[in-house]
UniProtKB/Swiss-Prot annotation:
Its cofactor is Zn(2+). It comes from Metarhizium robertsii (strain ARSEF 23 / ATCC MYA-3075) (Metarhizium anisopliae (strain ARSEF 23)). Residues 651-660 have a biased composition (Polar residues). This is Vacuolar membrane protease. The record marks Y338 as: Transition state stabilizer.
Length: 1032
């Protein structure tokens, strides 16, 4: 039995290969997305790395919640310091402990390019380390936020280990009187983690795995034979979760200018793979390429830069405030466990630890080997108030199936795009010109007059058939797909939270089926061999137009995220070129016309001979032959008119693409139906397509498929899955409910675009199956409950006790539709009327409140609530400043709110305000956050009233407590000398929920909330207690 050609452009092979190619790409992408590469055996690990030890460390530090404002935080800090000492001693490292901190850096930083290091200053330095225990540094700053600028005072307690590099300066150079000149060599690498968790999570992924990774880096780089060339600083910072405070306090370290590069390890999910969230430049991305399992792309970096992703990490402090260059490696999935009690060791794995650790190890090792000039020198922005980290190169980077890494300059992508914009139309124009010159340009060819013998005959080529099919089908399929997005967003927008793949299946199946229905239907009505070529031409035009905008984005906006378009543009051009070159297999149009006309003449002569020889033949047969000049064929088809002798609708030569019936010109039809010509039998057209199309090659489509699909779909498909995983569960955080669904809809269209040139050849089995998939997923997506035990609805808790009003209110913040069922499951609010107000910062969320007077917090070992906060205030004699003394039991965090703006503040014993972290707003501010490292020491805060002046007395007046004070109705608009009182509200926060008796209202919520819901903290404190005073 003779087997057919498996690559012929027929329904069977096309259905098989298009399905196989897409599945061969998508299935591995999903596998990479859903799995983590296994960790190597202990024997295969780098020297000094022990994953068993790392796992035990993780279990120890995640035994309890350990936010900055908890005693467990101190225990975790002490444990990590003790483990660092143990590792150094085990590796035989002579280390010292340094208490240096609070170094006020000058505003001008030096670089080795401006002040070259003398050869005598640097010599080979032996192995060694210094452990910095910083309990000195504090920072005073303002934190500009839209409509809510606040002052901040923070006392840090970071610790960090400086691993001496072989080319670092000798001795304790950071104690030098001229430390800037010594540190200017600036080749040190900062590796950062934060050891605090949120008050509602155990912090396994955020950020425990990062910190135990730093311990393993310490063990590796202090092992024999692994001393780095450049020094490495392993920073364990505190209070990142509450405002990036630890990284800001590191700004007062004597080593901050020594570190020109950094590796920040973070967690915004709970396990899975650690992704390269963002990086500052190409050089840093190339350092990451040494990772055994790289994962990430420049798209995330561009999204952060444009504010599409608003999550903040210590990366922003190192880059924006210090001017360092480096990268952010972070866990990102599943976000439903982020900042909840499910961020624990049970929901992660050793494999995830290894994925982050291996990336950090490879990147740090690469950065520590760089020369002092690669990341050191004058900045491209010319700023002298930041670390002189050299001139970065904008880049593009992405991974291939989590196994390999591509990184190249953004200028290279721009050159690629520009080359495509200029050369591809020229090449296609030249090829088209050559085809026209050789009379082989069949696209848009209508008819050719041919003279054979004594007569002249017109031969039709059907060169416009199929021209408008693709844009029409694309518009309709896109409109229906986007319409389904809005339908889901209206009815059940959070279904993507737990059933992302169901949403993907719905969008892909809908676009596929509608595209096939329209394109296959058009081909059935008016078969055309040019449909594939026309679709490819449209694809090329679309990508060329989009590339114009991409070039502008690359050149003017430094956006590398458009790199998938360059792939599609390149391959669309190559596919169109193949379709044009295929026409060289056809005869010249005039030759074909003469051939057809000659055959027609021979046929007529043969018919006449037959008539003369058989004059008594049936009259109907004679009549049918006479009608051969006008009818399509003697045999009725689905396009034959119902009434004999009547032309079908749309039978003229100027028929539309989607005509219901049609008639072919005589010569074309005769060639298709004539059975007596051996040459035509050798090249039969497919399914009544144009007669000349039989000579076209039937295998070139497969090359076009392999050009268009594999690389482009791999690159875009990876981004599509990451997009769904990253933002699919952000709706409960207050983000847009439409954006994740719209992302899936648009990306589904873009992923299937390369299939459209071939889809009209797909047999009905595949699209009908996908139609059933669409019906099933549509019903499921519209009706299914969006949350489950593994994908729990996240809501936010806060309890406020107002000592002046005597109120105790619990606020549950979230999407009201689901918060109300949560409240109904809790005993305390039973019977209460629950009122929900709009969140002032996140319009999608609501604050639903209920009275919790029956569950007062016990945050200070039985102390009465009224005695927890002590506050006193006095004004200066001239009425221009206020001194506030504030203390609270068993907490490190308090806030001061003022009834009208103040125009300056200072904390006794604190540093002056640091302009690196924000300027003071000209309109003043009305809130100050106060953080301390100790549990007993109070705050003495001086408030500068600026233009507001309180009544002037000879002696300072002490403030009096009030039961209840209304806010200043004037909004703080006081004039100098106005007799107006200042109302100061102290709000102190408690965050330690490790004991159920401490915050019983919180534990009641945890105990009785539905299985499909999970609670997280709303603000820094799970409990806030407020107390007001007035200064008259």
């Amino acid at each position: 039995m003779k087997l057919g050609n498996p690559f012929v452009f027929r329904p069977g092979p096309v259905s098989f290969w298009t399905t196989i190619v897409y599945l061969a790409i998508i299935i591995p992408l999903i596998y990479v997305q859903e799995t983590v590469p296994p960790a190597p055996s202990e024997k295969e690990l780098p020297q000094g790395v022990n994953l068993t030890e790392a796992w035990l460390d993780l279990e120890v530090i995640t035994r309890s919640y350990h936010p900055f404002n908890s005693h467990s935080n101190d225990i975790v800090r002490e444990y990590l310091m003790r483990r660092s000492r143990d590792i150094l001693e085990r590796n035989g490292i002579d280390y010292t402990t340094d208490l240096t901190g609070g170094v006020p850096w000058e505003s001008r930083y030096l670089s080795s390019a401006e002040h070259p290091v003398q050869a005598a200053e640097v010599s080979a330095r032996p192995r060694g380390a210094t452990l910095f225990d910083d309990r000195i540094s504090n920072v005073t700053m303002t934190n500009p936020q839209p409509n809510n600028t606040m002052g901040r005072y923070f006392e840090g307690n970071n610790f960090y280990v400086y691993i001496h590099g072989s080319e670092d300066p000798e001795g304790d150079w950071w104690t030098s009187d001229n430390v800037q000149r010594v540190a200017r060599n600036g080749a040190g690498v900062l590796v950062n983690c934060h050891f605090d968790s949120v008050s509602t999570g155990y912090g396994a992924t955020d950020d425990g795995m990062a910190c135990i990774s730093l311990l393993q880096l310490l063990s590796h780089f202090t092992s024999e034979g692994h001393q780095p060339k450049n020094g490495i600083v392993l920073l364990f910072n505190n209070a990142e979760e509450d405002g990036l405070f630890g990284a800001q306090a590191f700004g007062y370290s004597p080593l901050v200018q020594f570190c020109n590069t950094f590796v920040n390890l973070e967690g915004a999910g709970a396990g899975g793979r650690a992704m390269l969230f963002r990086t500052t430049d190409l050089e840093a991305a190339e350092a990451y390429s040494k990772s055994p399992h790289p994962f990430g792309s420049v798209v995330a970096s561009n999204a952060f830069e444009r504010g599409v992703i608003k999550s903040g990490t210590d990366y922003s402090v190192f880059v924006d405030n210090y001017g360092q260059r480096g990268l952010d490696i972070a866990f990102y999935s599943p976000r439903s466990r982020y900042h909840t009690e499910e961020d624990d060791a049970r929901h992660t794995s050793v494999d995830s630890i290894w994925h982050m650790l291996s990336a950090a190890l490879a990147t740090t090792e690469s950065l520590a080997r760089t020369t002092s000039t690669q990341f050191n020198g004058p900045r491209s922005d010319g700023r002298k108030d930041l670390v002189q980290s050299g001139r970065p190169t904008a880049g593009v980077w992405f991974d291939w199936y989590g196994s390999s890494w591509s990184a190249f300059a953004l200028r290279g992508l721009f050159a690629w795009t520009l080359t495509l914009l200029i050369t591809t139309p020229l090449v296609l124009f030249v090829v088209t010109y050559l085809l026209v010159r050789d009379d082989k340009w069949y696209f848009f060819a209508t008819k050719v007059d041919s003279t054979v013998g004594d007569g002249e005959e017109t031969v039709s080529f059907g060169g416009w058939k199929g021209f408008v099919r693709f844009p029409f089908a694309l518009v309709v399929a896109t409109a229906l797909t986007i319409g389904s997005v809005f339908l889901l967003a209206k009815v059940n927008p959070l279904i993507i939270y737990s059933s992302g793949y169901s949403v993907w299946a719905m969008m892909i199946s809908l676009f596929y089926f509608v595209s096939w229905l329209l394109l296959r239907g058009a081909h059935f009505v008016r078969p055309s061999a040019l449909q594939r070529g026309f679709t490819l031409i449209w694809l090329f035009i679309i990508t060329w137009v989009l590339s114009v905008f991409a070039a502008v984005a690359e050149d003017r906006m430094n956006m590398g995220a458009v790199y998938p378009l360059a792939f599609l543009h390149t391959f669309a051009f190559a596919a169109v070129l193949i379709s044009l070159l295929e026409q060289y297999a056809l005869p010249a149009k005039q030759d074909f016309a003469r051939q057809v006309s000659g055959e027609n003449e021979e046929e007529e002569e043969q018919e006449q001979e037959n008539l003369l020889g058989d004059g008594g033949n049936d009259a109907n047969e004679q009549n049918n032959e006479d009608r051969g000049d006008t009818d399509i064929a003697a045999t009725p088809t689905e396009t034959t008119p119902l009434r004999a002798g009547e032309e079908g609708h749309g039978s003229s030569e100027q028929t539309t693409t989607f005509a219901n019936t049609y008639r072919r010109p005589v010569p074309e039809t005769r060639v298709e139906t004539r059975s007596g010509n051996n040459r035509k039998r050798s090249f039969p057209p497919y399914e009544n397509e144009q007669a000349w199309s039989g000579r076209l090659p039937t295998w070139t489509w497969f090359i076009q498929l392999l050009l268009l699909v594999p690389l482009y779909v791999t690159v875009l498909g990876n981004l599509a899955l990451v997009q769904t995983t990253s933002i699919g569960k952000t709706g409960t955080d207050g983000s847009s409910l439409l954006a994740p669904l719209m992302g899936v809809g648009i990306l589904a269209i873009l992923l299937l675009l390369p299939l459209t040139p071939f889809i009209h050849r797909v047999s009905h089995h595949v699209p009908l199956f996908l139609f059933l998939v669409f019906i099933g997923t549509l019903i499921y997506n519209l009706t299914a409950f969006p949350f489950s035990d593994n994908n729990r609805f996240k809501f936010y808790f806060k309890q406020v006790v107002d000592l002046d009003k005597g109120s105790n209110v619990v606020t549950l913040n979230g999407l009201e539709e689901f918060v109300r069922p949560v409240i109904s499951s809790i005993p305390t609010p039973a019977g209460q009327r629950i009122h929900c107000d709009e969140d002032p910062f996140l319009s999608n969320l609501r604050n639903c409140q209920y009275d919790a007077s029956l569950l007062p917090p016990d945050v200070a070992d039985g102390e009465e609530l009224e005695s927890l906060i002590s506050i006193e205030a006095s004004k200066s004699k001239n009425g221009k400043t206020i001194l506030v003394s504030l203390d609270a039991l068993n907490t490190r965090v308090c806030y001061l709110d003022t009834s009208f703006p103040i125009f300056g503040f200072s904390v006794h014993g604190g540093a002056k305000r640091d302009d690196r972290f924000g300027s003071f707003p000209p309109e003043g501010l009305q809130q100050i956050q106060l953080w301390r490292r100790d549990w007993e020491k109070g705050w003495n805060v001086t408030l500068h009233l600026g233009g507001h002046v309180l009544p002037m007395n000879e002696d300072s007046v002490e403030a009096t407590e009030v039961d209840e004070v209304d806010d200043d109705p004037s909004g703080g608009e006081l004039k100098r000398g106005a007799a107006k009182e200042l109302i100061v509200t102290a709000r102190c926060a408690w965050s330690d929920a490790n004991s159920a008796n401490t915050i019983p209202a919180f534990h009641e919520v945890k105990q009785f909330m539905p299985r499909w819901a999970i609670v997280a903290k709303k603000t820094v404190g799970l409990v806030e207690i407020t107390k007001k005073i007035k200064v008259a």
